[in-house]
A protein has these predicted regions:
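Active-site-adjacent structural elements that line small-molecule/cofactor binding pockets in enzymes
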Residues: 1-155
Length: 155
């Protein structure tokens, strides 16, 4: 069983009781806590990104669909419904969302975001395209990202 962790305590629990770790932030201390507690299984990272032909459009989409992601797990875990998520993130700008969601048409930008997780010790990467433009992202992935990732040409 894979266990999601947003903090060291949960990562240690995943190391003791789970078969794998899942995270959404490139924090090396979570992999360290998982391993120090006996975890030897895969370490999965969900990497949020938003592809669009223009960086500004990607930021706008990420803001519309994923602005709550900047609040972090300690806040998100306490929010009971969608209205609460909206209230907790009403002040978040598209530029702020772009600090946690890789946005735009640049393969290098997305590869850098992925590499932060690889450098933090995650060995399985889950790409999450934010917003409704899944087909465009899949085309971009096929043309620009897949070979670099498969060849481990992550900067």
């Amino acid at each position: 069983m894979a266990i999601a962790a947003g903090g060291s305590k949960a990562a240690r629990f995943a190391g003791r009781k789970g078969d794998a770790l899942i995270v959404t932030e490139p924090r090396a201390e979570l992999t360290e806590a998982f391993v120090s507690a006996g975890g030897s299984g895969p370490r999965y990272a969900e990497v949020a990104m938003c592809y669009a032909q223009r960086k500004e459009d990607a930021q706008k989409t990420a803001h519309q669909y994923f602005r709550w992601s900047v609040t972090g797990w300690p806040v998100m875990a306490e929010l009971p419904d969608t209205d609460s998520f909206a209230a907790a993130s009403w002040h978040v700008s598209p530029e702020t969302v772009a600090q946690v969601v890789s946005c735009g048409p640049s393969p290098e930008r997305h590869l850098e975001a992925i590499n932060r997780y690889v450098q933090a010790g995650y060995d399985h990467i889950i790409l999450v395209q934010v917003g409704p433009h899944q087909g465009e992202f899949l085309d971009f992935f096929e043309r620009k990202l897949a070979s670099a990732l498969r060849d481990r040409k992550v900067p």
